[in-house]
Amino acid sequence: MKFNEMTYTRPDIDALLARCRELGAKAAAAPDGDALVRLYYEQSEAFAEYNTAANLANIHYTCDTRDAYWKAEQDFFDANGPAVTNASVEISRAFLANPHVDALTEKFGTTCVAGMKNAVLSMDDRTVELQQQFNALVSRYQQIYGGALVELDGKQLTIPQLGPYKEDLDPAVRRAAYEAEAGYFDAHRAELDELYGQIVQNLNAQARVMGYHDYSELSYVRMNRIGYGPEEIRKFRDQVANDVVPQLQKVMALRAKRTGIAHPAFTDLPILFRDGNPKPIPGYKARMDAARTMYHKLSPETAEFIDFMQDNELFDVESRPGKMSGGYMTSLPSYKAPFIFANWNDTSGDVDVLTHECGHAFEGYVAERDPAIPADLECPGMESAEIHSMAMEFLTAPWHHLLFGRDTDKYALLHAEDSFVFLAYGCEVDEFQHIMYQNPDLTPDERNAEWLKLEKKYRPWIDFDNLPFYGRGAGWQRQLHIYECPFYYIDYCLSTMAALQFFLLSLTDHKDAWERYLRLVRRAGTASYTELLETAGLKVPFEEGSIKGIAQQMTDWLENHQV
């Protein structure tokens, strides 16, 4: 079924909550493990209609944040979502209270019961009103960001549409693009500062109600991180600071030599090549045709997937006024259909987001068609889900010439370099958030000062050159995740460590790398992050010394593939 044929009906919340109470009672009273397993499948399916409606509403709202109807529907789910989540948690509580609960682990693997325990530990009826307030704060941030229009080159442009100007070979054009963006954020400075302060206070209040010191503790439970915690993440960040950042300084020196910009400022960093960055082929249809060919050549599984996605028009990837920034994949369970949202801006990032979100969507497509995997276990934790997307960016490389033509080698270098350099920024975002939630009374200026300290730690090569907004340490405010989903961002780093290993493997044996990837994908959400890495034969980045060799291999490859 094509996306525009999918019908939306606002769900009956009272009926859903009653169904949840019924399922909870059945789970508590299930007489044996077999009955409990059947009920687990049943409760997973019970939320399909609600989740489909919620995701349809969110798709339509983010495609046009100015549409009053979809804004009202989004408000409905913002208001009612916490009650539905809490009802789901009560079902989990009933499963956990049943003496036969170990049958779920035997049937579905380690993440099923561990995930329910995290769900119970992360939710509380006393936080429902706070959750509703948080949802409203996030929606307001999305309105500010999604409604951004700036004047440049005689045009009214959205933030994503500034992308090509930021990559222009003329430094004055690049500077003007960044200043236009900065002007918008500076104009909304007071509200953005206030919103973030309210978000920190709100989430910390939720954490304290539930017995946690602050939200940095609760977030690990809510993110359903299984088998590791803040200490492992701190060790990971330390390895990045000690073993990756020194290598990145070499990489940035190579970039400066390659571009001829001896002392690059922040506005010069998007320039990776003297004659300009790689450009994908123009035109929506041409790109979609190339993507179809690429996925047909990659594997039979991806061929079936891309045909389903394109034939059913499950992409909205072109930028336009009123459309929310960013990109995502979401699922429409009732139709067993993934959906991909993006904002193309005629830069190489268009291919990044296409292959990235197709990685998410491919995993969802595979999991939804495996009858043994309950809906609740179709997707793993986010640090694992991002492996699907980031590794897909690399594993499609043999066919990137279909999208880049003569710029293919440039894109290969840009993509590998950007992915490697990203590790530092991702760790910076994560450490910043730990500081913010552990020190909630910091003033806006103090928050920005902390960000600038972390810039020196993780990205010492950056020179803001008195750039408005960024130069005062407020650049973090344009990072959607910091407002919308705190502590999510480190997941990209953990998955990048897996993706870089897939990349290095694919250089010597692409078939083996793909088969490892497919094994990982097929486990869906039934295994933890470390278990999934072990399934694919990859190193776990929490272990001391696990990153150093990978960092050296990446630096060597980049040095040997300068264009």
Which residues fall in each region the model found?
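Long, well-ordered alpha-helical segments
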Residues: 196-213, 251-255, 359-369, 390-407
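C-terminal, non-catalytic "cap/extension" segments appended to globular domains
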Residues: 115-117, 227, 354, 362, ...
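Post-HExxH zinc-binding segment in Zn-dependent metallohydrolases
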Residues: 242-243, 367-368, 379-407, 415-416, ...
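Glycine- and acidic
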Residues: 122-123, 179-188, 228-234, 269-280, ...
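Active-site recognition of the HExxH zinc-binding catalytic motif
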Residues: 342-368, 389-390, 394, 432, ...
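A well-structured
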Residues: 1-278
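Inter-helical turn/loop segments and adjacent helix faces that build the functional surface
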Residues: 230-231, 254, 258, 298-301, ...
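Auxiliary, metal-adjacent structural segments of Zn-dependent hydrolase domains
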Residues: 275-334, 347-348
